[in-house]
Amino acid sequence: DELIRAGGTVDVAAGTAPDADDVAQGHLQAERALDFAACIGCGACVAACPNGAAALFAGAKLAHLSLMPQGRIERGRRARAMTRELDALFGPCSEYGECVPACPAGIPIEAIALLNREVLRAGLRGATRDD
């Protein structure tokens, strides 16, 4: 719940951002985003991890939202906020991959790589940018 409150949703008013239906979204990218959206937040990945990490869950949420036009608006803020909560509430990712076979939704380990990419991207862009 804390991770979702920290950034697991699209919270900003889009303002002048184009409507999602107006933005051409490639079929493969949309399918990829929907694959990550399959995460049900059950916690099986956390239970399977020897460190109690929630990196697969957080990665699935960040990947899903950053791949869709609606979620790109606040992707930097979301990555920073979610990783702050992730670090405070869960153990570090062991990178052993025990979480993947435990996931009933079939979220791939690529979600953890995408989590790391979003965090790095947000850090390189600085605390003042959200894109």
Give each language-model segment a name:
Residues 2-38, 42-131:
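Ferredoxin-type iron-sulfur electron-transfer modules in oxidoreductases and energy-metabolism complexes
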